[in-house]
Design a protein with these regions (language model features):
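Metal-dependent DNA replication initiation modules
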Residues: 45, 134, 138-140, 149, ...
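C-terminal accessory/tail domains of diverse enzymes
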Residues: 29-127, 143, 154, 221-433
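Aromatic (phenylalanine/tyrosine) cluster motif
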Residues: 8-10, 23
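Surface-exposed, active-site-proximal loop segments in enzymatic domains
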Residues: 145-147
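Short polybasic linear motifs
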Residues: 16-17
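Short, Lys/Arg-enriched N-terminal segments with co-localized hydrophobic residues
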Residues: 20-32
Length: 433
């Protein structure tokens, strides 16, 4: 993508100074702030957990198969007190969800992710299928609705939007002290979420064709009336007032259909970040989860220090998310601070710099930085799918290779250093191609 020099001349000193102010503010925050107490009262990392959605596919053809209820009927039942992941239905019979345990460390999260994938695949194998972590089906598919009353009501009301909805997301929950802190976090992480989408992008195909997007799942999901970014809320009271205003329209069936990119959980004292595709590799997913926890921690520290949230509109954020959905990490993104085009590696570096103290405090910095570098160099699941398609000319091969990566055949190319961002004052390039 070409960006004319006039764009950078036009924004000139105004955005450069704004970027410098954000940079200096972050530096001061990083050097002076201590970690706030978490829910248990001690200065320990926040708890977090993940939910992964998988496609169920034929073990030979890669075609989605409507086997979710059959899988769960044969899967061993785990008590809620077991402390491990569990399996659940999603809206379509071609999907299974693995719900991970509450974790304190990145090592616990990645172990839970791998165990959840193992459980899902074990259940799928019991009916001749496999569980695969791709966010849309490369093969053409006609989804089969799970015949539960809520889903049937949704199908009646939303028609083709639900009938065609066969997408797999990755949801990260991070503990917050209360709803007020949670909303303060939501207001402060908004601008960073498109970078997470780019890093997770894993859905280039839809109904047998390359869509031209790295995450077409995000495009398909955006058809829902509440999907996407929100304006800033400012307080817990305003958040709940806004949600109630959506419910009183009668458009939504219930609060479960509040599909913001990030929201307060209805059932747990957590912030839930929902923007990401399910990642092909477990290590990618764990890194995304750690990035989310770092963002939540950084945002809470800013709030406790009285630092106001950024004043970006939902429209600006929608553009950034759209660009991330289109490009993944293979082209330009919108800069999280300046809202202008920049290389994907620069956007990732700015994110890492923003949350580095939080990552260091939780012991995640080295592992997450290395994994981000691998994603940038080796590519996301979207790039992997396209490379397989190019080399084999077979959508079935795309799916079956993804099955292997889902369950441990992880591709770790040589990690490359994440490029440092340009100086906000002197090194803003005059053109990019």
């Amino acid at each position: 993508m070409a960006c004319g020099g006039g764009l950078y001349s036009f924004i000139g000193s105004r955005l450069a100074v704004a970027g410098l102010e954000a940079f200096l503010l972050g530096a001061a925050l990083n050097s002076s702030m201590t970690r706030p107490p978490n829910r248990s009262g001690g200065e320990v990392p926040r708890t977090f957990g993940v939910e992964e959605e998988f496609l169920l596919v034929d073990a030979t053809t890669g075609q989605p198969v409507p086997a979710a209820e059959a899988c769960l009927a044969k899967a061993p039942q785990r008590p809620e007190t077991s402390g491990g992941p569990s399996l659940a239905l999603e809206v379509q019979q071609e999907q299974l969800e693995a719900v991970g345990p509450v974790c304190s460390t990145l090592q616990e999260v990645i172990a839970g992710i791998r165990e959840g994938r193992r459980l899902a695949d074990e259940a799928a194998r019991s009916v001749g299928a496999r569980a695969v972590a791709v966010a849309t089906s490369p093969m053409p598919a006609t989804p089969t609705l799970v015949a539960q009353p809520r889903f049937l009501n949704m199908a009646t009301r939303f028609g083709v939007t639900l009938r065609e909805q066969l997408t797999c997301g990755f949801h990260v929950h991070v503990g917050v002290n209360d709803g007020e802190e949670g909303v303060a976090v939501l207001d402060r992480i908004r601008r960073w979420l498109p970078v997470l989408l780019a890093l997770s992008a894993n859905s280039p195909f839809w109904q047998g064709a390359d869509t031209g997007y790295a995450s077409f799942r995000y495009q398909a999901w955006s058809r829902w009336p509440t999907a996407g970014p929100c304006e800033r809320f400012g307080s817990e009271r305003e958040y709940h007032r806004y949600v109630q205003s959506l419910l009183t329209t009668g458009v939504l069936l219930d609060e479960g259909m509040v599909y913001f990119d990030a929201r307060l959980s209805r059932n747990h004292p957590t912030v839930e970040v929902r923007i990401a595709d399910v990642c092909m590799e477990a290590s990618h997913a764990a890194a995304i989860a750690a990035l989310v926890r770092g963002l939540v921690e950084r945002a809470a520290r800013e709030w406790r220090s009285g630092i106001s949230e950024p004043r970006l509109s939902a429209g600006q954020l929608r553009l950034a998310a759209w660009k991330a959905s289109q490009s993944g990490v293979d082209d330009t993104l919108l800069h999280p601070l300046l809202n202008i085009p920049c290389p994907a590696g620069e956007a990732v570096q700015v994110l890492l710099s923003h949350i580095r103290p939080a990552l260091a405090d939780s012991g995640d910095e080295e592992q997450v930085t290395a994994e981000a570098a691998r994603i940038l160099s080796a590519g996301t699941g979207a790039r992997r799918q396209r490379e397989t398609m190019m080399s084999t000319q077979s959508l079935a091969a795309v799916v079956l290779e993804a099955v292997g990566h889902t369950h441990g055949v992880e591709h770790h190319g040589p990690a490359q250093a994440v490029p440092a961002p340009a100086s906000y004052l002197t090194d803003i390039p005059r053109s990019r191609s």
